[in-house]
Amino acid sequence: MNQFVTNTKNVIRGKYHPEFLQNEVLADIFAHTAQTLPDKTALIEADKTLSYGELYQQALIMAQHLALKGVKPGHIVGLWLPRGIELLKAQLAICLSGAAWLPFDMDTPADRIAVCLEDAEAVGMITTDEWYEHLAEVPQTKWTNTELQKPLSESVSLAKTTPDQPAYIIYTSGSTGKPKGIVITQKNICHFLRSENSILGIQEQDKVYQGFSVAFDMSFEEIWLSYLVGATLWIAPKSLVSDPERLCQTLKQEQITVLHAVPTLLALFPEDVPNLRIINLGGEMCPDSLVDRWALPHHQMFNTYGPTETTVSASLELLERGKPVTIGKPLPNYGMLVINSERELLEQGETGELCIFGPSVAQGYLGRPDLTADKFIENPWAMSVEEELLYRTGDLAKIDEFGQVHCLGRADDQVKIRGFRVELGEIEAALCDIDGIGTAAVILRPEDGIDQLIAFIAPEIDAKQAIEIKELRHNLSQRLPPYMVPNRFEIIEEVPRLLSGKIDRKALKARPLTSVVDRSESDQPQNPAEEILFEILNRLFPNMPIKLDSDFFDDLGGHSLLAAVLISNLREHAEYSHLTIQNLYQARRVGAIAALMLEQPEPTLFDSQIGQDNPRNQTYKWLCGIAQLVTIPVLISINILQWLAPFFTYHYFTGGTRDSIPYAIALSLLVYVSVIMSSFVLSITVKRLLMLGIGAGRYPLWGLTYFRWWLADRISNISPVYLLSGSTLLNLYLKALGAKIGHDVTISSVHIRMPSLLTIEDGVSIGSQVNLENAKVEHGHLVLGSIHLKQDSYVGSYAVLEENTVLEKQAHVNALTSIEYDTVVPEGEIWDGTPAQKIGHIDEQAKLPERPKLSFIRKIAEYGYYGVSALIIACLFFIPIFPSFLLVDWLDVNVFNINPNNHLQIALYYFILAIPASAMMMMITAVISSGLRKIALPRLEIGTYAVHGSTYYRKWFAAQILETSLQTLHGLFATIYAPTWFRMLGAKVGKNTEISTATGVIPEMLTLGEESFIADAVMLGDEEIKGGWMSLKATKIGNRSFVGNSAYIADGTVLPDNVLIGVQSKTPDNREMYDGQTWFGSPALLLPAREAAEKYPDHLTFKPSIKRRLMRGFIEGLRIVLPAALAIGVGYMIVLDVIDVINNYNIETGLVALTLAGLLYGVGCFLIVALLKWILIGRYQPRSAPMWTMFVWLSEGITSLYESVAIPNFLNYLRGTPMLPFFLRILGVRIGKDVYMDTADITEFDCVSIGDRAEFNSFSGPQTHLFEDRIMKIGQVNVGNDVVVNTRSIILYNANVSNHAVLGPLTLVMKGENIPAKSAWIGSPAVPWVHK
């Protein structure tokens, strides 16, 4: 029997190895290793080590002491010591004495220790001198590890134990309220060690990490498998066990080769640990995403499964990428099968209860014959004496056709909380022991997205006093570990039961948590602030007692939306308008919130500086508007000429019998390159001329200076600056615009409003999509100011710097940080968050190598490399349009051959022909971009690279390929095709993942888990460039995690499963994040609870049918190709028209016709989108809709067309003009008089209301929808009169910004939040703006 044996009814067995069944005990195994390898290091703890010989001799002395105190084979000895060498020495001593150890975790309550010792009839307990007093109530004899190590005058002989005697006892949660002890014999454990290691293959040369508590039986894999082969155990300190990032580094430093861990811990490691030879996982389910990340060629990654009752593990699987994660097949000499409730054997593929048999199955529970008879039953399918006992695990499972076992969760009332097995009955029994409680039932159910223990309590009929929840918590915390204390207690008259008499847990899970509470239980408010607070809380929580020490989240059940509502209601009272949502999260308790209400706030920016609005000059407004109206057609025409000129060239030189298509293509590319070069020259020249003589200051809105600035700003947008991002050419371009740029400056990408007022000194590093906003409009004025970045300063990605700001030498501004106007960041300081605050002093430069030198020759060479590369890339991505032309022409001549009679027919005809041509162009572009990236950068590894080195150059080239391709493929984002596109680029993307407009992506470094969601404008894992070096780290997003709009995810982030990162927020340190958490803000703030999403069926959210996938695929396919088809169709119409004009008149007249055609094209693009919006959607209303529904597809389609057709071709040129509000009204926006809009970023137009004289600066706007849990939620945004919204500020739906309010840069107004009138706010989340 050397192979797996599987019969047709689901009985599978591991390989048969009789040599693993030896007549031995653990003491024999250790003694053999100690004799064979006496000088080999056995244990390492910090700077202490013990060899196997030393450990054996020292443990032997302790064992002899125990023998002198009467300890014999068969006895039980408790073990309660801090982790370390002394603990393992005591464990071995008990083993050598012939007794069995009963281990306890360091944090186990003394009452529970006493219960277990009494139940096990332990003869004594080993502990420390310090802990001795905690066991005063324990009747058993207690020995300290110090006294057991005193020298002996003479040697003491030790009695020999037998294989059938106990080796150790592990206590787990018991369903009757009493913990149950599982006795593992010497035979059980010795067989297990040899069986499992025959597959794991731990060797003498290995260095094994020891991190588990000895009360958790996975620790025996760490300890005793090492003892079996003579490996070295490295004992982790307690502080390291809970710090995954530091642990990861320590594993590398200590060159650990074997890691036994739970999957949750491994998932939190920020990077690979190459020296790990074996990774053995167990204790909980292992997600596929973890396998994708860690199942690498240099690791052997195993998944083990087994209850304590079968000795640590019973099955094992070598995990490989691309294979489903299972618990594998039985270990050698073990067997598994699946039965139904009638204990009948089930066929392959059928789900039932998993059962285990073999020589390592325990004999039962200590002193619990009834429970033993229920769980350990006779095995009718046994083939030997060793298989006669069958253990019923209580886990649901099935066995597939390959003999792999799939574990599907618990079948009984046992649950897992944070990795701990918990019998609900034990909690219920502890509750029933409390006076006044008649019956109790405990269930596990999700509340606000988090699994929580809910206790339902029926009081005794003749109870003398009411049940006090606080007293209940205190009582239980004395008897149970913290993870077993229920999160919530519900008082009910009677616990529902089934006909069988058992508790009806299904009814409890469905029962609303709305028990009525007597208001007399509430505290009485003692001052006006408390009266107002209690009145609002009573409205929000109508059935809850309100006490001053009640926690808003834990006791009252508050969540994110209720937090916003509470603060908004309090702000309606002028004296409390300074309160913030952040205050609530920090204070939490009702009394602490009331105390904050009484604090005197600091004077805000509004109070001190900008309380008065300035009247707008209507004459200036209309004169400026007329001037803008004259220039806009020219701007649109210049923009359209960039693609229409080569389009025209191609068609002008084709069509005749002697025309050469290759010649036409070459000439078109030459024209395309010329247009690109000319656009840079034009934008530089015109901007320098327009801004001549304009300096820092305040200028009237709509005045002459404003018009000159507006026109210069608009014309600078015509050149494709994205081609220069991250290169030294960008510095050259900014210099040409008037900026003062020093030597060896690195700029990834910036948005600069006034280059002539920008100074960047030597060695400065600037991240991606940084806003240098030294121009803004507020209160009827254009405000211009300088920005000065001094030597070696640093600005992180997505940061915003306002006018008149200075960063001193080596000042460090973190990502997603706002530096408000008139701010100086001192030398060497690190500022973070919005509003920015000092968080430390820079020492990062000391960690980096010396800045690589940039010689003059290399600088010139880089100019050449970046310039030629940029033009080559631009041409490569223009080339796919020519096959589309050929296809259109071929379809025109060979398939349709129709001669339209007018311009509208021509446009429609060529638009239809262009649809398949556009699809082909998209596919060619996708293939070219993914292929070129792999050629340019075949392999990219984690590390640090010089920005003036080959890796950076190649990485830049690959990044530019991606950036340039997105000019064509932008429509792929937020569609069903986006994950495939990211996979083509090299990212690891799980099933059913949604990806919107993610930026900064390094595909090779990105892993997205299954069913994760990346929202709009997320900066996702971009590289950090600082001090002349580029750092690359892997970024991982866990399964079902959500990253909100405009969030910043730093490279190296490892986001656990089911985590939500809020809008315009960033993540905390990896070690602070755990499954199921919600973080928002900058800096990140942990949200205790968030608003529960409306429930929809799975087929509308996460698990759609094939039909819905096909329908969405079709609609989104059209949405991708239609913008390009529209451009090609209109392009044909314009080209044919202009060729006709040139042939009949002259080139000058043709250029005029081309300009007019460009204007009509821009207006037409807007009108088409507006028409489609009203036909397909009608008027937007507040609502929610699951993702896999027609409304969402159509709405997202309209948004995509608006962003890809209407904005770039028309509305962008209306930003900052009096005309933009008019066109937004056509789309449905309710917008007042004299509104200034430097943004067109609005989606659900009808849900936006903007008051008179409001001012929206660039990249700001209302956000009327969010996706959470695959549900699109739409709400109203109301902005009052005379409101100022600064750069990159977002107002979420159901929020209200009252009259005369000011929102600073990078500010987030939360859902349901109300910003009071005549106040100034800044930050994410918003806080009163106190300018310092």
Swiss-Prot record:
Q: Which UniProt keywords apply?
A: Cell membrane, Ligase, Membrane, Phosphopantetheine, Phosphoprotein, Transmembrane, Transmembrane helix
Q: Which cofactor does it need?
A: pantetheine 4'-phosphate
Residues annotated as binding D-ornithine: 221, 304, 306, 308, 313
InterPro entries, per the entry: AA_adenyl_dom, ACP-like_sf, AMP-bd_C, AMP-bd_C_sf, AMP-binding_CS, AMP-dep_synth/lig_dom, ANL_N_sf, Pls/PosA_C
> TM segments?
629-649, 664-684, 868-888, 908-928, 1120-1140, 1151-1171
Main enzyme class = ligase
Protein name from the UniProt record = Delta-poly-L-ornithine synthetase
Gene Ontology biological process terms from the UniProt entry: amino acid activation for nonribosomal peptide biosynthetic process; secondary metabolite biosynthetic process
Domain writeup: Consists of three domains: an N-terminal adenylation domain, a carrier domain with pantetheinylation motif, and a C-terminal transmembrane domain.
- Give its E.C. classification number: 6.3.-.-
Catalyses:
n L-ornithine + n ATP + H2O = N(5)-(L-ornithyl)-[N(5)-(L-ornithyl)]n-1 + n AMP + n diphosphate + n H(+); n D-ornithine + n ATP + H2O = N(5)-(D-ornithyl)-[N(5)-(D-ornithyl)]n-1 + n AMP + n diphosphate + n H(+)
Phenotype reported upon loss of the gene: Cells lacking this gene show a similar growth as wild-type in static or shaken cultures but show slightly higher biofilm formation.
What positions does the entry give for L-ornithine binding? 217, 221, 304, 312-313
Q: Where is this site: Important for substrate specificity?
A: 218
Q: Name one GO molecular function term.
A: phosphopantetheine binding
Ranges where the Carrier domain occurs:
524-601
Known Pfam families for this protein?
A: AMP-binding, AMP-binding_C, PP-binding
O-(pantetheine 4'-phosphoryl)serine sites (modified residues): 560
Highest taxon, organism lineage:
Bacteria
The family assignment reads: Belongs to the ATP-dependent AMP-binding enzyme family.
How does this chain sit within the bilayer? Multi-pass membrane protein
